[in-house]
Structure formats: C-alpha cells, structure tokens
Amino acid sequence: MMTLGVFTINLEIQHSVYTFDTACFYTDEETELDHRLQALRKQINDDKHLRSEIIALEKKGGGGAEASPSSTNQKTTPDPRAHLRGKQKRARRKRMDTGDSIDEKRSHLLTAQELKEINKSIRETKNALKKKIDENMGIDRHVRQEAISPYNIISIFDSNLTRCLKMSTTDVNDTLVVVKVYYFGVAENIIKRGFYMNGEHYVFFSASAGQIRTKKFVAIKESAYLEVMDALTCGLSAETINAHGGVNINKYLAYLALCNSATTLWAKFPIEKTIVVDDFETMVHGTVDHIDPSTYTITRQETDVPITHTDGCGMILPSLSKKNFMLRAPWVKGLLAVFPFDQFIREADQRDPLVNHALITDIYGQQHDVFKEGIQIILTKSQFKMWKYYSSWSEYQRKFRQYGCTAGKCNEEPERIDNAKFNYQMLQTLTDLTDEELSKICEKTNRKLRDMASDRQTMLQVFGATKKTYRLNAFQKSLAYYPELLQDPYCRATLRDLKNSIELQAVAGRLDIDGKYLFLIPDLYAACQHWFCHEETPRGLLKNGEVSSRTFAKHHKLDVLRSPHLYKEHAVRRNVYEENPEIQKWFATDGIYTSSFDLISKILQFDNDGDKSLVCTDPTIIAAAERNCADVVPLYYPMAKAGAVRITPEAKYNGMVAAWTGGNIGEISNAITKIWSNPEPDVDAVKILVMENNFVIDRLVA
C-alpha cells in the first residue's frame, strides 16, 4: 500500500476469475474433433523438435551422451537470445542426453509422405470443426465442466466493476469471465446468445482496447449485471441510446469497459461541485505534410489546423488534490490537471471589477457561478463520452446519486518520478548519429554495467532495494536492512541474470538516459482566458516553441518524445519555467505544459487524457534531434469516423470482429523499422505507414 497525495493506492487488491478459450465452450462432437486436431498437430511439432535435436547433435560432431553439451568444456560465444529459450534448450538437452544416437533419432522421423498425409488430415479436421461450429450457431453454449479448474484462473485488479459486483479477494469469483477467442464462430454464438456455466446464464459485457488487441472479451453473470447495470452506466440504457439514433458501437464498448480499468475508489468524489464545459479549441497556423489517404500523395503546405487543446483534460483545484491524476467514472475518462482556476477568476475580477468572471456555461447551455456553486472540478466535453444522450448535466448528477455511481482514480503522479529509458524507435530516427555520439548516449548504461560488479549502491539500485522504491518486497527489505546479503550465492546469481538482461535490453535500444515520463498538459491559463474571459484566441503563458517543466527547471532545452515513435517525433522545445515567475505560479505540477500556438500535439500525435511524454534532457540526444528534425513538420490527414448504429447483439459482434481484424500495429511498426534501417530510408513511405498505423490504432481504441 502507498499514499500519493490525498489518495491511498492498494496495489494488492486482486480478484480471481475464470478465463476460458473458445474450446471450453465446445460440444462433445466439437471437442472430439478438436482433440483429433491437437493430436495431429502434436505429431508435426514433435517431428520438428526431433529434427532440431538431430541438427544440434550433428553440429556437436556426433550423437549420444558423450556428444552432449554437458560433456564439453569448449567455450562458446553466448547467444544474446539464449535466456528467452532457456527452458526449451534445457528440455532439448535432457532429451539429447538419453543416449539415443543420431541414427536412432532419425528412425523416428516422419517421412515426407507421412507429413503430407498428416497435414491433409489437419486441414480436413479443421474444416470439419469449423463446419460443425457453423451448424451449431443457434445452440446454447455451456462451459465444459472439465474447464472449470484451477488451471483456468487469473487475477484482475480492483476496479469500479469489481467493487460494484462486491467481488471477493479470497475466493474464486464466478460473476466475471474472460473469454479468449480462437474460433470466431464460437465467439459469435456467445456474444449474441450468451452462455451457461453451472446453471447460470452469462452475457457479453465489453472489451478494453488491450483485450481487443489480444482477442479477448469480458462476459458477466446476467443476474449480477442486472443488479449493477444502472450503477455502471449511470442509468443510460441501450434503449435510450437507440432512441437517440444509436452510437458508434466500438466507442460504446470502449466507454462501457472504462469501469473495468484498474482504479482506486474516490470515496468522496464531489459530483455536485463538478461541471462540464466545451473544450478549448483554436486554429493553429503552421506548416504540415498533408497526406491524402485515397491517393497517398504528400503535399507540404501552410494551413490553419484545428486543435482541441483540452482533448481529454479537465481541471481540479489544488485544495482537492496536489497531484495530477486520471479520472474514471461512468462514461467519463481523462486527466484531471491541478490548476487554481478560482485564483484566476479572482485576479480577473480585480482587473475588471464590472464583470463577473466566475460565470461559465456548461455544454448544455446552463450557466454556472463557480463561487456560488463551490465548483472544484471542471470537466470538458471530450471527457464526458456520452454527453449527447443526457438532456442536461443535472440529469447525469441526479442519476449518479440515484444509482449509487462512484468515481475512481488511477495513474496519479508519484512524489518522485524515476528516470526513464530510451528505446530503439526513438534511436532509429536519429539516422546520422556518430560513433562518438552513440558512446555518449550509452554512457550511463555502460557505467551501470561496470558498477554492478563492484559498487554496492548500484547493486541495491538494480535490485530495487533503495529509498526510491515505494513498495519493497520481502527480498528487497532484507537487502536494504542487511546489504551483506549481496554476497549470498543466490543474490550473486540473480545479479548475473539482471546484468545479462540489462545488456540484452541495451542491445535492443533500451538505454538509461536523463529523462522522465511526464503528463502532457495544455496551457490551462489560456483555457481559463477562453472560458472565463471569453477570449477567442487567448495569449496564455506559453509561446510557440515553448514548454514548461518544473521537473527540469534547470534545463532550458528539452526533447519531448512520445511512443509509439515512428516518424521523427522529436519535438525539441525551450523550457521557460525558470525564467518566468508567472509560469512558476500557475504551472506548479510535475507535468509538461505545451503552448496553444504550437503544433506539437500533431507532431507527437497526443491528446491530453493522460498521455505521457518522455522528456529528455540529454544534450547529445537533443543536438542530434535538432539536426535530424530540422526539416520535419507534422503529418496531417483526415481521420475517418464510423457511423452510429443501433446497439444490438449483432452490432456488438460486428464491432468486435472489425476491431479484431482491423489491422496489426506490430506489422506496420516493424515495416517502418526496416525502412529506417536502410542506408537511404524512404521517408515518404514512413509517413504513409505512420498514417495507416494511426488508422489501425483508432479502430482498436475506438
């Protein structure tokens, strides 16, 4: 347990639930076909492993125990990927040491004709299974009894959903089930019709963006869902949404899944002292590379770009929280950034006493007086995802109280922000780095590797047994109290493994640098000028090319980065925190504040709903970024919007399939990496692939 600001975060609250793949819902006939299919595949896999063993023995120069790896003292160059295959290698060596000769092993290999026959049987059995699943589309699916076992239990973190369902932290809970999809036919059946387990009916609930990427979804016991449905949806039913013309189904599922985010209960969330206002949006003039998605033509042009500066960001008074954090409530998500908007209003009143600057209009046209109503939190329209389905903010507040809805928080700024690591994507776009520059960038990592063998403090740091670690486990506590344990054989062996791991990470581009991950926050002073002083294009406190970072107050130039980093997303900006007392007064958190006159959000492709930036102060990286990105401008292209549909089981299934089959982020980013590895990379191809990658992300996260 740890305390951050006004909240206590208990990371140990977890709940055990069942997880089943689609095979766990098969009928007896389908199961028989599946077992036959697995047996055939096992023959193929066993043959592949046997061939690998024979090749390994031949490389050793013979067969039998005397040729096994354990009988030679020859020193070989370590394989940098060996730790990833350690278990497989040990198992293979064990089989190789049984004394069988190469000829004996060859005698067990499948012939070409046998392989052909088995592969033919695999195709036929697979087609028969698919046909049987299609024939059974209209049946009620049941979880097979043998699947309800300890092998199919996972743990999930505490969330609004688990709290509403009053889930146990000690027993296995049967109210939620996570389903892993292998055959779409079975998934279609249970998404549309539900399924039964132990006599109880379960219905499809939703899937988070992360679950969609891994082809998973959550089902819920129907009787339990009916009890908590209004608390989870703040009284907004599918019937009401359909009466308003429907919704983008994937957005709906993503927003419904917000209650399943790992959060800590915000017990005294002041719903009565919260309002929702229109976002702060302006046109920002600048040069962009415009991409036409239909023709892939790229045109550099000067234009006005519409930017929603507060996209996903709201404000909370310092009296309620000293730290920025992310909020979760029914249909509400985003960042709450600390900002004294009450003080802003008072100072505006002093400058112009004839105007009541405390008046602000919400998204429904209702005027509010910040002081008279004691407003402590200002949300923005972009944070209130289903705002159009409520007639007023008062209706949402009333239903919030009526149905016992709750809010949660997550990802609060820590008291101490650890240094971050560079990654290969950020490194590969600095295409002209010299060997000397690379050596400087690797210096911290190399120093750590050297000191791990001799410096006690470095050893403790690597183990996480330092004051900077918030939650020490028993092993770390032991090391902290008695560092002499570092000489223990177990510790020394673990240290060697850690050293190897750090070396492998460094080879893959994960390098220690002077940098930290910070919340991205817009110029909230400019937002208040817009909301309370009614300025269309407020000046704010930051000019184009400027940022504010209290964390790096002494560093006047920063490289602002964000993942995924695919196309030279190095935004080198001037940090003006130290030179401007007004900025120190208003931007008093550990986030990084960006200007409302800057196209930085288009360069880094971020919004402000809790996105973080890797803010780097390394002078070598900054110099290389300035050199490599001198002619880089933001990519700009229209994002397609899916239409609204009625919420039905059919629509839910179609939405899930569209997300599952909508593209593979990894394939695109890997293709981009291959392009950057060329001596003369095709930069235009990278730009187009980045656009396609963002289209895929948009489909996945709705």
Residues of each region from the PLM?
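Short hydrophobic-aromatic micro-motifs
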Residues: 559-561, 613-616
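Conserved small-residue
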Residues: 1-64, 69, 73-75, 79-81, ...
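Short active-site loop/helix that positions an aromatic residue
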Residues: 602-604, 615-630
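Short, conserved aromatic-histidine micro-motifs
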Residues: 628-648
